[in-house]
């Protein structure tokens, strides 16, 4: 099974096949409305506006698994994103990305690209310190570590990159551009 064999539910509960995005460059991101990384919505929306007409899509999967930072209903989350960031990209139903109840899309993505570290800088060090308090062995498993982890999928459905929430958004935009 590949990327295009996966599906998720949209905020209204309709099944959305990843096959709908066949031939496009896709960024799948687990999000939250009450996270220190929530302002990344602004940069995600800018990427969407810049590249959507060239075949770029974002699949936004709200998730409440990290310190309960997406506590609202699907409608409340959607309204928050519209009001604060004017997001236009597709937003899915809130879902688990880790554990027994993780949706199939995330099981697949994690099987393709595991955790490779938080990178450099103060935020990366802070995330590493936080994760050590949660799971001393966090570096050894492919699980999603926090909100705003991103997976980049090329036009053929290959998962080509995983970006942790600490990744530079300009670096992500450049990776998207290179695939368009």
Segments from the language model and where they lie:
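N-terminal "domain-start" segment that seeds a small globular fold
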Residues: 1-19
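Hydrophobic beta-strand anchors of alpha/beta hydrolase catalytic cores
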Residues: 25-27, 150
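Amphipathic alpha-helical repeat scaffolds
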Residues: 10, 30-34
């Amino acid at each position: 099974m590949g990327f295009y064999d996966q599906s998720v539910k949209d905020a209204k509960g309709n099944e959305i096949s990843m096959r709908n995005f066949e031939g496009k460059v896709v960024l799948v991101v687990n999000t939250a409305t009450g996270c220190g990384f929530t302002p990344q919505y602004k940069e995600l929306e800018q990427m969407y506006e810049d590249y959507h007409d060239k075949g770029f899509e974002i699949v936004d999967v709200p998730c409440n698994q990290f310190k309960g930072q997406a506590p609202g209903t699907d409608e409340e989350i959607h309204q928050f994103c519209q009001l604060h960031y004017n997001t236009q990209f597709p937003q899915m139903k809130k879902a688990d990305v880790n554990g027994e109840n993780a949706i199939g899309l995330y099981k697949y993505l994690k099987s393709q690209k595991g955790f490779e570290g938080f990178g450099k800088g103060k935020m990366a060090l802070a995330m590493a310190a936080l994760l050590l308090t949660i799971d001393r062995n966090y570096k050894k498993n492919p699980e999603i570590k926090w909100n705003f982890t991103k997976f980049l999928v090329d036009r053929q459905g290959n998962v080509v990159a995983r970006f942790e929430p600490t990744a530079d958004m300009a670096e992500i935009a450049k990776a998207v551009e290179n695939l368009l």
